[in-house]
């Protein structure tokens, strides 16, 4: 996701950008050079801030902060916040039905937090009593055990995950969210407050990935259900409010339609790469062991354990095979330790290497004969099309848009978690030079013709110009209806009227310069503690792609 945001921002210098970066904690590292047309960047740490306003409103006059806290009296909380909190808890009982009223609830919460103190409101006795009484009443008569610890953690989650809506949302021409999740709520608020067009790009399906993460979490049933309902509600509100939802592959559209997006608002925009940078090597090194290369952050969604088991399968036919995984192996230390233990258990220590972060992704793929992807969830993985552009045959699991990239037999697609077919497919290619060469040639050709960065940037440029009311080429084609969609009625708001002085020949020139699209997020959090919480359902979705780039 970070690679995508960097490409789009760097590639559209005519668009002024204001960034809203939702991060896991305060321990963040800015690892991308921001161009001059990025006018501002606002970080919102969900965890770790003793006083969140130090980050969310760092430029606010101290007197304003003091006055907001002073007006957050017990009476104000009881009159204004408790009814909103109760409405939210009631909405969580049926997140699949979220629509206009729930979008307005998000806006009303934002209006409240702009005027009153978020921290004082959640820490109040009135809020705790309302939360406890409402939840226990909802659970009355059910078989679900709800402990005091569950209630405390549930309220803490609400405190943290609602931080992105605690500050004023500036008026822009377009709001662009990188997922239908908590970061996207800025788009919901801006549309209802200002009539701002709202665009969502779906790399993966946020709710689906939370289901996967929570299934392995050690939390109670109550907490798992509570968080999944919250994510479901937030995702659906984003979907039904968005003017355009652009998945990075058609595969995601099925989920989007089931989550309330009408087909006429779904316009797929594939990821794109610079095929002049990602190129085949000039020559192959002599004497290299048969090598399988992977670019992946080491955490559960990438299912590195299946890749390790596939290595054990492949070495039966290719005894000197070497698997090399490039990518951050510190983001989930317990998972990395499990992988290391599995390597030892299977006796593949001499065949499997975690090589860490690679500082030159365009040459990473040259270090293998074949590229492998073992993920259990993806959007449209950059790593697959980068490998294709570098002339590396691909063996990948059937997740996300992988089949759309490898259409026509350009690679080998195997079932997720299927270490036997994955290992056999890799062995087949390593032992068949002619087939590797054919797939390399056809993969490179498809990457150049279909997945160049120019096509992606043109589609996003058109999207921005269209929704900003500027002359534009036709939008990407809308999605054909699914066989069994269950769309909700979209939230309808009249488009904003642009000033007459607004430039008509570009988005960044002219006498009347206005703030431009908001892209949440572009800053990734490399904190191991936060990443571990993330994969247990306690944090935001992964901020980067395969390597966290």
Give the role of each language-model region.
Residues 251, 272:
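Carbohydrate-associated surface elements
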Residues 376:
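Aromatic "clamp/platform" in nucleotide-sugar-dependent glycosyltransferases that forms part
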Residues 322-337:
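Glycosyltransferase donor-sugar binding loop
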Residues 408-419, 428-434:
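Conserved acidic donor-binding segment of nucleotide-sugar-dependent glycosyltransferases
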Residues 336-357:
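Nucleotide-activated donor-binding/catalytic signature segment of Leloir-type glycosyltransferases, i.e.
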């Amino acid at each position: 996701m970070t690679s995508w945001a960097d490409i789009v921002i760097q590639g559209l210098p005519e668009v002024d950008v204001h960034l809203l970066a939702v991060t896991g904690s305060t321990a963040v590292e800015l690892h991308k050079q921001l161009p001059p047309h990025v006018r501002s960047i606002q970080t919102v740490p969900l965890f770790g801030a003793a006083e969140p306003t130090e980050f969310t409103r760092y430029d606010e006059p101290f007197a304003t902060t003091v006055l907001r806290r002073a007006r957050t009296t017990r009476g104000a909380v009881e009159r204004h916040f408790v009814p909103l909190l109760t409405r939210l808890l009631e909405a969580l009982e049926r997140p699949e039905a979220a629509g206009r009223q729930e979008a307005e609830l998000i806006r009303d919460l934002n209006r409240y937090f702009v005027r009153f103190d978020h921290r004082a409101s959640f820490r109040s006795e009135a809020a705790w009593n309302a939360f406890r009484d409402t939840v226990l009443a909802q659970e009355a008569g059910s078989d679900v055990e709800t402990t005091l610890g569950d209630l405390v953690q549930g309220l803490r989650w609400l405190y943290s995950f609602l931080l992105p809506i605690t500050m004023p949302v500036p008026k822009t021409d377009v709001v662009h969210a990188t997922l239908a999740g908590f970061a996207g709520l800025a788009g919901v608020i801006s549309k209802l407050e200002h009539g701002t067009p709202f665009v969502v790009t779906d790399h993966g399906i946020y709710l689906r990935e939370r289901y996967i993460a929570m299934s392995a979490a050690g939390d109670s049933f109550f907490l798992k259900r509570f968080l999944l309902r919250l994510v479901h509600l937030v995702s659906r509100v984003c979907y039904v409010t968005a003017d355009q939802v652009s998945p990075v592959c058609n595969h995601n559209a099925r989920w989007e339609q089931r989550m309330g997006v009408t087909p006429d608002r779904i316009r797929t925009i594939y990821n794109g790469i610079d095929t002049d940078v990602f190129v085949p090597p000039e020559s192959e090194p002599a004497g290299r062991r048969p090598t399988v290369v992977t670019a992946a952050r080491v955490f559960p969604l990438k299912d590195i354990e299946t890749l390790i088991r596939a290595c054990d399968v492949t070495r039966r036919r290719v005894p000197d095979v070497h698997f090399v995984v490039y990518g951050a192996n510190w983001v989930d230390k317990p998972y990395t330790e499990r992988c290391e233990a599995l390597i030892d258990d299977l006796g593949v220590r001499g065949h499997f290497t975690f090589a860490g972060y690679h500082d030159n992704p365009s040459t990473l793929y040259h270090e293998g004969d074949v590229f492998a992807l073992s993920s259990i969830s993806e959007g449209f993985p950059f790593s697959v099309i980068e490998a294709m552009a570098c002339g590396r045959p691909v063996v990948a699991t059937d997740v996300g848009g992988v089949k759309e990239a490898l259409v026509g037999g350009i690679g080998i697609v195997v079932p997720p978690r299927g270490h036997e077919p994955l290992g056999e497919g890799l062995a087949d290619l390593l032992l068949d030079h002619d087939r590797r060469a054919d797939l390399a040639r056809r993969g490179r050709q498809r990457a150049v013709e279909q997945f160049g960065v120019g096509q992606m940037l043109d589609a996003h440029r058109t999207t921005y110009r269209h929704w900003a009311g500027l002359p534009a080429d036709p939008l990407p084609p809308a999605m054909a209806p699914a066989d069994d969609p269950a769309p909700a009625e979209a939230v309808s708001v009249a488009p904003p009227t642009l000033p007459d002085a607004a430039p008509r020949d570009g988005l960044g020139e002219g006498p009347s310069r206005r703030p431009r699209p908001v892209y949440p997020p572009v800053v990734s959090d490399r904190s191991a503690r936060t990443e571990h919480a993330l994969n247990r359902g306690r944090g935001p979705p992964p901020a980067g792609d395969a390597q966290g780039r």
